[in-house]
Design a protein with these regions (language model features):
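Charged phosphate-binding loop/patch that engages nucleotide di/tri-phosphates or the phosphate backbone
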Residues: 106-141
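Conserved catalytic cores of phosphodiester-cleaving nucleases, focusing on short active-site segments
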Residues: 34-36, 41-51
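Active-site-adjacent loop/helix micro-motif of nuclease/hydrolase catalytic cores
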Residues: 51-62
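Acidic-basic catalytic patches of nuclease active cores, encompassing PD-(D/E)XK
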Residues: 1-25, 134
């Protein structure tokens, strides 16, 4: 099983109170991997797995996430760091333009050990209820 498929299985298992749907990216390049909804709150999540701190997003993914953010959508990048056994969650607002990624994650949790349940509860709360960043006054083209 591919690493991103394993991460998808972890999300489904550990955040069961959200109605999750895995999206087929070949149908529409750039659309995030996962769509979830709970009590009328919708969220898109791009899943990434790495051994470094780099977020590898295609230009299509960057553009989709950036435009979704500009239109008031709730979308995130979930980065699983294999060596450190950490999840880092970034709001799509870190894409200050379609080609530039900045910022530290707004949520960083360890997903193993005795605190794993609490970590996943924090991830769920962050994805569904964290305040969205304000849009820039003059978004870059």
């Amino acid at each position: 099983m591919k690493p991103e498929s394993k991460l998808w299985q972890m999300v489904k298992k550990n955040i069961p109170d959200v109605h999750w749907t895995r999206l087929e990216s070949w149908a529409m390049p750039g659309v995030p991997d996962v769509y979830g909804i709970q009590e009328g709150v919708s969220v898109f999540v791009e899943l990434k797995v790495t051994r470094s701190n780099k977020i590898n997003l295609s230009p299509f993914q960057q553009n989709w996430l950036f435009n979704h953010y500009l239109n008031g959508g709730r979308s995130f990048i979930m980065l699983q760091h294999l060596d450190q056994r950490l999840l880092r969650v970034f709001p799509s607002s870190i894409l200050h333009s379609p080609l530039r990624i900045t910022s530290e994650p707004q949520l960083k949790v360890s997903y193993t050990g005795s605190a794993a349940g609490d970590a996943w509860a924090r991830v769920s709360e962050f994805l569904l209820h964290s305040p969205l960043a304000e849009k820039p006054e003059d978004p870059p083209l």
